[in-house]
A protein has these predicted regions:
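Bacterial N-terminal signal peptides
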Residues: 12-22
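Long, terminal "pre-/pro-" and other extracytoplasmic accessory regions
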Residues: 5, 25-206
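Bacterial N-terminal signal peptides that target proteins for export
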Residues: 2-13
Length: 206
């Protein structure tokens, strides 16, 4: 009887050991696959500005933009009205301060993705060259502004120089009371086309 009991105990022990080994084998985790590299994101000026607004309004509830500018790089030269990096300056008339904000979609260790901000500076609402403007007036985005600029000299220029970078600047002209896009061909500029950012109409070129 005792020998049978010992045999049964040894059998149970072997079964438990086998089960434990099987469990440990199943528990072995495979190494995670390497993370896929991120790709850069390119967006229009209005898209980038809308991304910056919450951060600017958090900085100051009355903040409105003064200026918006794009940058080009080896991945994007602005021919579709898009950029991977946009910079805006917002101002708070109530506080008498301005602050730069930026949006980046680039894969660059030196340029963090998303919205960031710079150093606060002084601001005077009396300076007509630094007037803020209401976002409701921005009806026309950079892709549309580019198409308009193409019809007024841009297309001819790019046919000659297909790699010429195109950058964008948005500001308010106090003299004409117009919110306008500057579509700038080349650095330094070989052609600048001004487009009404509310109506999309061609204004002038230089």
């Amino acid at each position: 009887m005792t020998s049978n009991l010992n045999l049964l105990q040894r059998s149970c022990a072997l079964l438990l050991a086998g089960a434990a080994l099987a469990f440990m084998g199943c528990d072995d985790t495979k190494p995670a696959p390497p993370a896929q590299p991120k790709t850069s994101q390119f967006e229009t000026g209005r898209f980038a500005l809308q991304k910056m607004i919450p951060a600017a309004r958090s900085w100051s509830p009355d903040a409105n933009p003064i200026q918006l500018t794009s940058s080009t790089n080896s991945e994007s030269i602005g021919h579709d009205g898009k950029s991977g990096f946009w910079r805006a300056v917002f101002a708070s008339p109530a506080r008498g301060k301005s602050e730069p904000f930026s949006w980046s979609g680039l894969v660059d260790p030196d340029v963090p993705r998303g919205v960031n901000h710079g150093v606060e500076d002084t601001y005077s609402a009396a300076n007509r060259s630094m007037m803020t403007w209401d976002l409701n007036y921005l009806k026309v985005d950079t892709d549309q502004a580019f198409e308009t600029a193409q019809q007024h000299g841009g297309k001819t220029l790019l046919e000659k120089e297909s790699k010429l970078p195109v950058t964008y600047l948005l500001d308010f002209d106090a003299m004409s009371h117009q919110l306008r896009w500057h579509v700038i061909y080349g650095t330094p500029a070989k052609l600048t086309v001004f487009v009404d950012a509310s109506s999309g109409n061609f204004l002038r070129k230089e």
